[in-house]
Amino acid sequence: MPVPPEVDPSTDPLNDPEITGRKGSRAIPLPRPGAGMSRARRAEILRVDHAGEYAAVQIYRAQRAVFEGRKGKDAIADDLTGMEGHEQVHLSRFEALLNQNRVAPTAALPLWHLAAGVLGAGTALLGEKAAHACTEAVESVIEQHYADQIAELADRDPELARELAQFRAEEMAHHDHAVEHGSREAPAYRLLSSVIKAGCRAAIKVSERV
């Protein structure tokens, strides 16, 4: 199971090498100017992040259901259980933040539930490497999404920025674990990865708005 690095809560996430130093990861952009943010923008951030973590839990859960109990699949089932656990922690935190800020989840949540379950089960049925390719694609979009938010929040809400930095570190650990376990050897890897990434980006846009 991937072990994510701990982020020192006293460290500015913009300068933490564990967050910005991974080879191939686009650097976190400079903070956007201005202090504070509108309630509407904060609601967008919490709503879309809650949706993303909800979908991640469903993907890993569906993949785990395919592999559990199958001969020779104990290792990947255990890995998926661990990663699902990380995502559940993230999801629980965003559920609390939605409640605290009186923000409703995205109206598209039932759609994401179905889509994530199909994606998770479908890639797992294609084999371990396809399941890892799914993880790599999803986490590459999510870690950059978090990077953009960290930049936006660094001066406006540093406490939330630090939480997102820890979550991002865990998403990156999932990504790297997938690559190390053969994600790029999956059948039709480039096509599979491109389609999943496009779907994730579309879901982000929708979840911010509704």
Kindly give the residue locations of the regions a language model identified.
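Non-heme di-metal
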Residues: 1-210
